[in-house]
Amino acid sequence: MIKVGILDSTLREGEQTPGVIFTVDQRVEIAKALSDLGVSMIEAGHPAVSPDIYEGIKRIVKLKKEGIITSEIVGHSRAVKRDIEIAAELEVNRIAIFYGVSDLHLKAKHKATREEALRTIAETISYAKNHGVKVRFTAEDGSRTDFDFLVTVSKTARDAGADRVSIADTVGILYPSKTKELFSALTREVPNLEFDIHAHNDLGLAVANALAAIEGGATIIHATVNGLGERVGIVPLQQIAAAIKYHFGIEVVKLDKLQYVSSLVEKYSGIPMPPNYPITGDYAFLHKAGVHVAGVLNDPRTYEFMPPETFGRTRDYTIDKYTGKHALRDKYEKLGVKISDAEMDQILAKIKSNTTIRFYRDVDLLELAEEVTGRVLKPRPPEQIEALISVKCDSNVYTTSVTRRLSVINGVKEVMEISGDYDILVKVQAKDSNELNQIIESIRATKGVRSTLTSLVLKKM
């Protein structure tokens, strides 16, 4: 029977993404969101790196003690006693000690022999255990380490007191069949020890390798929200969670909360989500080709691996030159507009003849229908309202601090600092005018906001 959980490393590995820095408050909020999501472990950072990381972990551990956060809290540490002491004084649940074990790392980085490395690993793990915490050892560059030596390293870590060893594919060179073979062999050769995989995504194989590691016996997968991390990052949390559910039937996190957590980290990291990103991208459940849309309208399983509602999403489709009559009729029915078959054919012909328009929005379709029918058409109220809120800040405040406060208001989709008469531009979405007014009032009530100007979005090209 497969047993697997998620260690989320957004606050440690994720912050190693170039250009990404989380404030203390952001670290705490992300940790709470990850706990609510249901990850098994939160790697909260490397406390010896900087005072803000230390303070962030301190506050996260406090929330853990209060029962607000339920995930196991992990502190990162070099194989250095002072690092271990700093992590231990924070009273984290587990200290994760890392050390490069490949011959390349031993020679180029540590300037140590294999024997010296084994002594360092044993001594530091034992030292951490003496502080009364659980210990994980990370075999950095484990995927390029001689297998027999990797077995010796794992046994040394186990015998010194570690109950977990993480195999790091540090430069992302593993491939699935090799990964399964590696973990199968390790779990066979080193009993009474559990293994993690820390898979980097340099070749785009991190998710596939994580699934293969599960098949080989790994019980914890390291992931980050949106796949953040050094260079091109590691396993994206939303992708591996969906894949584990689909292939193994195991729900390692609350899937319907992935969208919120992804958006939260997108805002705080400043790394935009590509629209075609799996699971949480704008296009993940958006269909285009006429044959596809017709299939989805009859039975969504034709072109969806799982229902979007599983992930707190909804399906939609675009209208353009690829559109068929099924999609167009469904769109007009949703708008509450009655169109005859002959009129529908004329509208569709106009759409297909205009090859330069990327998306036909609802307002475009209404204009086309009125042009063809000669009638003034009254659609149902829109399902959502989009607006742009221009914000002017008080002269004595730091604009970025206001931007951060605005970015976490419900309904706010994007926040941009701009030049000109206003300081910030906020993109918002609301289901109706009442909700829009509530969002606007929340923006106006934000500390540092002097005035606002609201513009409704009528059409997108």
Swiss-Prot record:
Classification via SUPFAM superfamilies:
Aldolase, Dimeric alpha+beta barrel
Q: Which GO terms describe its molecular function?
A: 2-isopropylmalate synthase activity; homocitrate synthase activity; metal ion binding
Q: State the EC number(s).
A: 2.3.3.14
Annotated active site residues, numbered on this chain, are: 292 (proton acceptor)
Question: What pathway annotation does it carry?
Answer: Amino-acid biosynthesis; L-lysine biosynthesis via AAA pathway; L-alpha-aminoadipate from 2-oxoglutarate: step 1/5
The UniProt keywords, alphabetically, are: Amino-acid biosynthesis, Lysine biosynthesis, Magnesium, Manganese, Metal-binding, Transferase
Give the cofactors, semicolon-separated.
Mg(2+); Mn(2+)
- Report which superkingdom the organism of origin falls in: Archaea
Record: residues binding 2-oxoglutarate: 12, 76, 136, 170
Q: Which Gene3D superfamilies match?
A: 1.10.238.260, 3.30.70.920, Aldolase class I (3.20.20.70)
Its Gene Ontology biological processes?
Answer: L-leucine biosynthetic process; lysine biosynthetic process via aminoadipic acid
Pyruvate carboxyltransferase domain location: 4-259
**Reaction catalysed by this enzyme:** acetyl-CoA + 2-oxoglutarate + H2O = (2R)-homocitrate + CoA + H(+)
Q: Which InterPro entries match?
A: 2-IPM_HCS-like, AIPM/Hcit_synth_CS, Aldolase_TIM, Dimeric_a/b-barrel, Homocitrate_synth, LeuA/HCS_post-cat, PYR_CT, Tscrpt_reg_AsnC/Lrp_C
The record's Pfam families line, in alphabetical order, gives: AsnC_trans_reg (PF01037), HCS_D2 (PF22617), HMGL-like (PF00682)
Instruction: Specify which residues bind Mg(2+) according to the UniProt entry for this protein.
Output: 13, 198, 200
Q: Which NCBIfam families match?
A: LysS_fung_arch, PRK00915.1-2
Q: What does this protein do?
A: Catalyzes the aldol-type condensation of 2-oxoglutarate with acetyl-CoA to yield homocitrate. Carries out the first step of the alpha-aminoadipate (AAA) lysine biosynthesis pathway.
As for family, the record states: Belongs to the alpha-IPM synthase/homocitrate synthase family. Homocitrate synthase LYS20/LYS21 subfamily.
Could you tell me what this protein is called? Homocitrate synthase
Q: Say which species the protein is native to.
A: Saccharolobus islandicus (strain L.S.2.15 / Lassen #1)
